[in-house]
């Protein structure tokens, strides 16, 4: 699951923060309307990316250690399933904590403010669907 959490964070940070530029880490608190706010948000985007990198490195370390055990069983379905669960869990936790509880940012801040909630709900549905799909894939292995 750690791989999925890390990859979910990378997807969010790279695609939503950098490529599409829909939001930044603190863009609801500090809107991107000045160079100072952009620098602050970019810094916290980097902190966020560093955290996701730690998840991926931790997953790689655990996988490496486990793979060296003689009783370790390789299963593509289980691996893909746990990655989907982790990715989906990232979306659910980030969607609830960052978007709703703390209000740090919302999924798509480039649309009218009245539409932000729809994007946030879609993000949560996407996360729940990945968890469910991952669970089904993992059970069949």
Regions found by a protein language model. Give the residues of each.
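Interfacial helix-loop-helix junctions of multi-pass membrane proteins
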Residues: 16-26, 95-116
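N-terminal signal-anchor transmembrane alpha helix
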Residues: 1-16
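Cytosolic juxtamembrane helix at the C-terminal end of the final transmembrane segment
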Residues: 134-141
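Hydrophobic alpha-helical transmembrane segments of integral membrane proteins
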Residues: 1, 52, 74, 79-81, ...
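Cytoplasmic juxtamembrane regions at transmembrane-helix boundaries
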Residues: 61-86, 141
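Membrane-interface loop-to-helix entry segments
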Residues: 38-61, 114-133
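Perimembrane loop-to-helix junctions flanking transmembrane segments
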Residues: 23-40
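Alpha-helical transmembrane segments of multi-pass membrane proteins
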Residues: 5-9, 86-94
């Amino acid at each position: 699951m750690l791989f999925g959490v890390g990859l979910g964070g990378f997807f969010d940070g790279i695609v939503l923060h950098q490529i599409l530029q829909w939001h930044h880490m603190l863009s609801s608190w500090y809107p991107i309307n000045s160079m100072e706010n952009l620098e602050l948000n970019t810094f916290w985007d980097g902190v966020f990316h560093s955290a996701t990198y730690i998840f991926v490195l931790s997953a790689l370390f655990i996988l490496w250690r486990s793979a060296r055990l003689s009783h370790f069983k390789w299963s593509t379905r289980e691996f893909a399933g746990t990655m989907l669960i982790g990715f989906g869990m990232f979306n659910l936790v980030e969607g609830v904590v960052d978007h709703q509880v703390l209000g740090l940012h919302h999924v798509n801040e480039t649309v009218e403010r009245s539409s932000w909630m729809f994007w946030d709900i879609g993000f949560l549905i996407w996360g729940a669907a990945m968890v469910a799909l991952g669970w089904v894939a993992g059970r069949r292995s």
